[in-house]
Amino acid sequence: TAWIETRTEEEMKIFSKIVKITHNIINEAFSSKVIKVGVTTTTDVEWWMRQKVTNIGLETWFQPSVDIQRNDEINQDHLRSFSNRPDKKVIQKGDLLHCDFGITYLRLNSDCQQMAYVMKDDDEQVPLFLQEAFKKGNQLQDVLTSNFVEGDSGNKILLNSLKQANEMGLRPSIYTHPLGSYGHSSGPTIGMWDAQSGVKGNGDYPLYKNTVYAIELNVTTYIEEWNRDIRIMLEEAGFYGE
């Protein structure tokens, strides 16, 4: 094993707290406390998250991002590069929100992507078609983590997971990376968004125990009610070890 990627028991106690803080900030950012429908923009939420982290004495290791998928969208913003992503979009009822957010504490880093639906006046719950789409995202998470085998390379884990997901009828994309002393830490790279056939070098590195990963991936699914594809984009910290 390599010492930079290996997490100690004490570090994992801290890591759990970092992830909990990250989730709590996202929950608040996506609540009516922060978002005023028809007024608040995606950029407003991004900077609220940044300021919240500063207020509690921590740091972000990258600028938070918030984007929207909606049923009347002509341009599929989730297919754009981050550098070409439109900003200051006003959040409306019926929007599907997505954020990418991570913080740093005691040299450890979180990296999280979560989504939220802005309910319309006649919604009693998240629409079933979105619930089904999220289930597909969760299925891919389960497929990927079930293929974590000590000693297997990142590329082997990637290809086994994609094969299994495709056989299940999913439209997967996996780009999972180690987390630790720096954001994209040392350890095996398990796919990149533009390298779904494997990553030369970093993807050849084996998986060791007592390591942490950003389980980062997405599933594309067609939403008949919106007459378009959407992506369920998820990222959660995961510990592989004893």
Give the residues covered by each predicted segment.
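Active-site neighborhoods and metal-handling regions in enzymes and metal-associated proteins
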Residues: 1-242
